Amino acid sequence: MADLLSDAEISDRLPEEWTREDDEIVRVFEFDGYLDASGFLSAAAGLAEDAWHHPEMTIRWGEVEVRLTTHDAGGITENDIDLAERLNGIHD
């Protein structure tokens, strides 16, 4: 099981555009339309599966909200930070 990050570690490592909400890190990715958003969601699902780390993802017209936490650790771990950075990489 992955170790929880401290509050200071989370603050220092939180990727650009991500915010912390309790025991999760959250970002809303914006797109020009639904098809672009769904394409990102599909790519994000592939990254998540490769990492064996499955976020909560919500698609709406022109945006995808992603929430990351490590359930078995009870909060935010290195796995969440790593996947957030990878998701930024396929969007930005």
Swiss-Prot record:
EC number: 4.2.1.96
InterPro entries in the record: PCD_sf (IPR036428), Pterin_deHydtase (IPR001533)
Transport as UniProt keyword: no
Disulfide partners: none
Superkingdom of origin: Archaea
BP GO terms, sorted: tetrahydrobiopterin biosynthetic process
Keyword NAD tagged: no
Pfam families: Pterin_4a
Catalysed reactions, semicolon-separated: (4aS,6R)-4a-hydroxy-L-erythro-5,6,7,8-tetrahydrobiopterin = (6R)-L-erythro-6,7-dihydrobiopterin + H2O
Keywords: Lyase
UniProt-recorded Gene Ontology molecular function terms: 4-alpha-hydroxytetrahydrobiopterin dehydratase activity
Annotated family: Belongs to the pterin-4-alpha-carbinolamine dehydratase family.
Name of the molecule in the record: Putative pterin-4-alpha-carbinolamine dehydratase
Native source organism of the sequence: Haloarcula marismortui (strain ATCC 43049 / DSM 3752 / JCM 8966 / VKM B-1809) (Halobacterium marismortui)
